[in-house]
Amino acid sequence: MDLTNSTFLSNQLTPFLSFSREQWAELRKSVPLTLTEQDLKPLLGINEELSLDEVRTIYLPLVRLINYYIEERIQRQQVMNRFLGVNPDKVPYIISIAGSVAVGKSTSARILQSLLSQWPERRKVDLITTDGFLYPLAKLQQDNLLHKKGFPVSYDTARLVRFLADIKSGKPKVSAPVYSHLIYDIVPDQFDVVDQPDILILEGLNVLQTGDRSSQTFVSDFVDFSIYVDADEDLLKAWYISRFLKFRQSAFSDPNSYFKHYATLSEPEAISTAGRIWDEINGLNLRENILPTRERANLILTKGTDHAVELVKLRK
């Protein structure tokens, strides 16, 4: 790819290099595609139709880039170890994935986990979502915060920071709480155990937030490479409503579902309800707390109408 062209030169006054879909695809080079259609299907979200072409075009160049960063980090760590004369515990490389509800963060995280684990080094790649660090439903109800679920105030951030501090210190068998979307709550006495992986992918709404830098340690302080998955709010709202309609016919009909009362809504009622939830909760959270963190990411993936990434921005 010719990086002397006008598109590249226009990036000179910004903190990011911008790539069209076609330009980014060229950076795949010779990275092989290790996923099949059969492998891809279970990685997709309920409202996403992501093709192998998207994996080739967007995710293979990204995996190539991340592996360069990991190799560079390993080399720097080896230099430090020789200087200090120490043989420290293995420290995982942490990748965070942020973005709005319904943008496809979870799908991106699962695809990256699969691709990175199949790299020739056969690295161990774990995936944790920050949903597990939401306060329990009873506490949110007690504190009158149910309408703020997903907002920064609804997370046990101190617990999440301790979890990441343990991971980064090389501690083995670190436990993370498990969240169930079915019951809309933390699952009692159930944990995911992270045991010294080579890479940890952390996926969540607010993983790029920093708040008041003078007084706290933040999730972003532990992250080595951060990704923000972006789309226009009109698209996000439409995707959220479409997903809500599909849940109405599937997960909401489960008698154990917290949202089982939505299963009886007519389609117009469901569309109206989903739109109201977006306007009052998810859209508000996006504008107030999530979108303002976008420019802190190392990489921004901007999606278009069909969920395909149209623009990639890489921090210089």
From Swiss-Prot:
Its EC number is 2.7.1.33. ATP binds at residues 99-106. Gene3D superfamilies: P-loop containing nucleotide triphosphate hydrolases. It comes from Pasteurella multocida (strain Pm70). InterPro entries: P-loop_NTPase (IPR027417), PanK (IPR004566), PRK/URK (IPR006083). One of its GO terms (molecular function) is ATP binding. The keyword Kinase applies. Pathway: Cofactor biosynthesis; coenzyme A biosynthesis; CoA from (R)-pantothenate: step 1/5. NCBIfam families: panK_bact (TIGR00554). It is an enzyme of class 2 (transferase). Keywords: ATP-binding, Coenzyme A biosynthesis, Cytoplasm, Kinase, Nucleotide-binding, Transferase. It holds the Pfam family PRK. GO terms for cellular component: cytoplasm. This is Pantothenate kinase. GO terms for biological process: coenzyme A biosynthetic process. Belongs to the prokaryotic pantothenate kinase family. It catalyses: (R)-pantothenate + ATP = (R)-4'-phosphopantothenate + ADP + H(+). It is found in: Cytoplasm.
